Every structure is written in C-alpha cells, then in structure tokens.
Swiss-Prot record:
Highest taxon above the source species: Bacteria
InterPro entries: Membr_insert_effic_factor_YidD
Family of the protein in this entry: Belongs to the UPF0161 family.
One Pfam family here: YidD
S-S bonds: none
Function: Could be involved in insertion of integral membrane proteins into the membrane.
Keywords, sorted A to Z: Cell membrane, Membrane
Organism per entry: Pediococcus pentosaceus (strain ATCC 25745 / CCUG 21536 / LMG 10740 / 183-1w)
Alphabetized HAMAP family for the sequence: UPF0161_YidD
Name of protein: Putative membrane protein insertion efficiency factor
The UniProt record lists the keyword Translocase: no
SMART domains: Haemolytic (SM01234)
Keyword Plastid: no
Amino acid sequence: MKQILLLIIRGYQKFISPMFPPSCRYYPTCSNYSLQAIKRFGAIKGGLMGVARILRCHPFVRGGYDPVPDNFSLKRNQKNSKPRN
C-alpha cells in the first residue's frame, strides 16, 4: 500500500503537476510533504498527514515553511513554521 501511494504521488509530480503553474503555499510542497510523511509514518498515518496538509493549502493561509513533524500530527508544525518570502 505504501509503495502504491508513493508511486501515485511521484506520477502526479512527473506528469500532472508540470502542466499547471506552481500554487503550493508551503515549503516543502504538498506532494513532497506527503511523500516524506508516508515514508516516515506509513501509508495510513502518512496519508492522513498528506491529506490534512492539502486541505490546509488554500489562498486564505499564509503558507511558509512547514516540514513533516517528528511525531504524528494532523496539525501544522508550528515549531519550525515561518512565512515564505
């Protein structure tokens, strides 16, 4: 399951994402965040973290640096978050 999710995200990054202008408000991008979360926490927890991150990525949020936390959480990583310039 983990490998399937990683393959889907990499496919999105390679074939779908390049067709649109960059729009992610966070660094790392939502797809990279999802890859890292799934690798670190597995398909279920990492997948949930990726979905939560995508739901947070909208025009009404400041965005900024939001790395995958050391411990499982569906909230933004406030410890290291700084607005993007």
